[in-house]
Amino acid sequence: MYGSTEELWFVEWEFRGTPYANRALYEQWSPLDFASKWKTPMLIVHSQNDYRVDLSEGYQAFTALRKMGVPGKFLYFPDEGHWVLRPRNRRLWWGVVLDWLDQYLRPGAVTGTR
């Protein structure tokens, strides 16, 4: 994600420098290295105009879920940024999130890999 966000300060602070100066720490916490252990269903929400987290990051996570058979859903907003702010989109966001939580958190819900 480094280099594809406008918020480099956060990444450099959390990882104590750039990936060029502290590669080991970046590799230690790379989601890609943990993806093979994912079992929890995930709802990924992304927007085209999000300059904080690049859209490709969400696609990579969703692709990993699909390849491993972990339940996942990708909700995409072509006209939003890092926050979903438009009223119509917020209603959709809330509906999808609440349906997702109901599907996986209600008593007797299916969890883990299908």
Give the location of each predicted region.
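Active-site-proximal cap/loop segments of hydrolase catalytic domains
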Residues: 1-114
